[in-house]
Amino acid sequence: PNQHFSTININTEGFRGKDISPLKPDDTFRVFVIGGSTVYGTGAESDITTMPGFLQREFDNYNIGYDVEIVNAGISGAWSFSEIQLIKNKILNLEPDMLVIFEGWNDLGRFSNFSTDDSDIITWTDTWKDRWLDICQIGHEQNFQTIITLQPFVGTGNKNLSEEEFSWFLKNDHSRLLKLYESYNQQLSSLEDSCSKTMDL
């Protein structure tokens, strides 16, 4: 906490960006964006050129009768297990109104280190689903919304890959990761009834 560099500021709560009050101000809707290095903004030139930073600027352009406060709760290398700990041990104490989870890539990488057996995919993704079901249930109890999103990566969607992207796809065994990604995608439907929203981006 309380670290300041030319392109990065870490506030008193340990999040990237400006300070936030532990007690949420009146007429404020507080949103935590949670994920890994993509959310944190690795390589971004400033705090406001991260995903949460751009989102904050969009809301700042509109007068909707109350303040929307976007908090960058991204941590490089974070995956679902560490994100759950962050939510339970810190974020719940900061009066969230909404959690937006940008999820997937780091969990996929963790699985590659965990197992070389594709039969473990269902067990792995069931555990992932159960973690977020727990958080969504807490959201119901404590009156905050939870949005779970799956982040895209090379090979998902209908984009034609460049030679460089295709080479990277083969080098990193993305064909196996795509099987795992599809299993995550299928688990989203199991979260729909408990979470506020789920999306495969």
What label would you give each PLM region?
Residues 27, 66, 94:
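Structured loop/turn residues at beta-strand edges in well-structured enzyme cores
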Residues 53, 57-63, 81-201:
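Alpha-helical cap/lid subdomain in secreted, periplasmic
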Residues 68-70, 198:
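Generic structural signal for residues in well-ordered beta-strands
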